[in-house]
Curated annotation (Swiss-Prot):
Source lineage: Bacteria, Bacillati, Bacillota, Bacilli, Lactobacillales
Record keywords: Cell wall biogenesis/degradation, Nucleotidyltransferase, Teichoic acid biosynthesis, Transferase
Domain notes: The structures of apo-LicC and the LicC-CDP-choline-Mg(2+) ternary complex show a significant conformational change driven by the multivalent coordination of Mg(2+).
Protein name: Choline-phosphate cytidylyltransferase
Cofactor: Mg(2+)
EC number: 2.7.7.15
Binding site for CDP-choline: L6, A8, G9, Y80, N82, S85, A101, Y185
Family in the record: Belongs to the LicC/PntC cytidylyltransferase family.
Species of origin: Streptococcus pneumoniae (strain ATCC BAA-255 / R6)
Length: 229
């Protein structure tokens, strides 16, 4: 079991905080966001960790010595969405977590006993243009829709078993060959082909994970953490 952390982006909506710092290295309680993820993974014995870097990539170098992670450079980080980041490490997808680096994890939700492809999901209200999971009592994902409502969303943490990963890689290769991937997120490979995939939902408590997508999100997280202490 391994983990792929997507950390190549510009973090434009977090400016000015990301003018000189990658979003994944923005500090929360005096620790970079990505270090919470790495340490939680290692707590569960998941030590093979690949970080896709791009913007200000040299700032991630210290993580190699501190945690023994692997860094992969996405030289197209300013041109494409995260589809290309996953394309670069597609052969690593089997039996791997895929994690968005802009998530603050309140607790360790990682499991080292997963055997099936899983989207970890929190319930959110008043969402705008969010990706929602549609599933039944068996927790198998039937559809992924983009909507503005309340419900369980893609939360930036997923796990992919080998058979599902093999299919996703074929979808990635097809999209790459077509050249029509500039605006794609890697999750489009799942969303657009969900009827061919066996993917399940792991429901998380609402206070498990928090996406930092803007300065307002960051300030809100600061308030949440202050009230917890």
């Amino acid at each position: 079991m391994k983990a792929i952390i997507l950390a190549a982006g510009l973090g434009t909506r977090l400016r000015p905080m990301t003018e000189n710092t990658p979003k994944a290295l923005v500090q929360v309680n005096q620790k970079p966001l990505i270090e919470y993820q790495i340490e939680f993974l290692k707590e569960k014995g998941i030590n093979d960790i690949i970080i896709i870097v791009g913007y200000l990539k040299e700032q991630f170098d210290y993580l190699k010595e501190k945690y023994g992670v692997r860094l992969v450079f996405n030289d197209k980080y300013a041109d494409y969405n995260n589809f290309y980041s996953l394309y670069l490490v597609k052969e690593e997808l089997a039996n791997s977590y895929v994690i968005d680096a802009d998530n603050y994890l309140f607790k360790n939700m990682f499991r080292n006993d997963l055997t099936r492809s899983t989207y970890f999901s929190v319930y959110r209200e008043d969402c705008t243009n969010e990706w929602f999971l549609v599933y039944g009592d068996d927790y198998k994902v039937q559809d992924i829709i983009v909507d503005s409502k309340a419900g369980r969303i893609l939360s930036g943490v997923s796990f992919w078993d080998a058979p599902t990963a093999e299919k996703i890689v074929s979808f990635i290769d097809k999209a790459y060959a077509s050249g029509e991937f500039v605006d794609l997120y890697w999750d489009n490979m799942v969303k657009d082909n969900i009827k061919e995939l066996d993917v399940y939902v792991e429901e998380l408590e609402g206070n498990s994970i928090y996406e930092i997508d803007s300065v307002q999100d960051y300030r809100k997280l600061e308030e949440i953490l202050k009230n917890e202490n």
